[in-house]
Regions:
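Thiamine diphosphate
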Residues: 1, 35-192
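Conserved thiamine diphosphate
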Residues: 1-36, 187
Length: 192
């Protein structure tokens, strides 16, 4: 895991840092990065080569526009890049325990916030969850939490503690950081 890149790269001025979910996303982002001249671009490498079969956006020129992939209410899950699959699993666990279908969001952009979408969530959501496969300190979730700082929205940020990991069991690291679907659902129930 490259767990320290998000805080380092996402705060460089004018840099666009993208987080693909699938191999197709990754290739489309690389193509866009090469074809456009407006910004320096960095693209994370997805942890898996999954394909969901849906059409892939080819143009990322509208910076910081997130994609709502499942519409729900009460809880919104913003699942970054390789943790999008975890977001899908957490959404199912939350729905099965609460009866409320969460909104699931693929942000694509690590470097900025979709202020328009985040503002809209205030109307019918009370909890926003962020999922990122990197350290929390200075990461993506902190950007979302900062956006909601002066509001009643509760933000639960999930990622890794700031520590060096060497020869580790990924499952144990996930459990230790409350990054399993059941742990996330439990936290949401306690927060609602």
């Amino acid at each position: 895991l490259g767990i320290f890149d998000i805080p380092m790269l996402s705060n460089i001025p004018n840099l666009v840092y993208l987080a693909p979910v699938t191999k197709e996303d990754y290739l489309a982002m690389i193509d866009w990065a090469v074809e456009q001249n407006e910004h320096p671009v960095a693209v994370r490498v997805p942890a898996s080569v999954i394909s969901d079969g849906k059409p892939v956006a080819k143009n990322f020129s509208k910076l910081n526009k997130y994609e709502v992939t499942e519409q729900g209410s009460s809880v919104a899950i913003i699942a970054l890049g390789s943790f999008y699959g975890l977001g899908q699993q957490a959404a199912k666990a939350i729905e099965s325990r609460t009866g409320k279908k969460p909104t699931l969001i693929n942000p694509y952009f690590i470097t900025g916030t979709d202020d328009e979408l985040l503002e809209k969530l205030k109307a019918d959501h009370s909890v926003v969850i962020t999922l990122e496969d990197g350290i929390l300190n200075g990461g993506f979730g902190e950007k979302i939490a900062r956006f909601y700082g002066n509001s009643d929205m509760k933000v639960l940020c999930y990622g890794l503690r700031k520590e060096f990991l060497d020869r580790y069991d990924a499952g144990e690291v996930m459990k230790a950081n409350r990054l399993t679907p059941d742990q996330i659902a439990e936290d949401v129930i306690n927060t609602l």
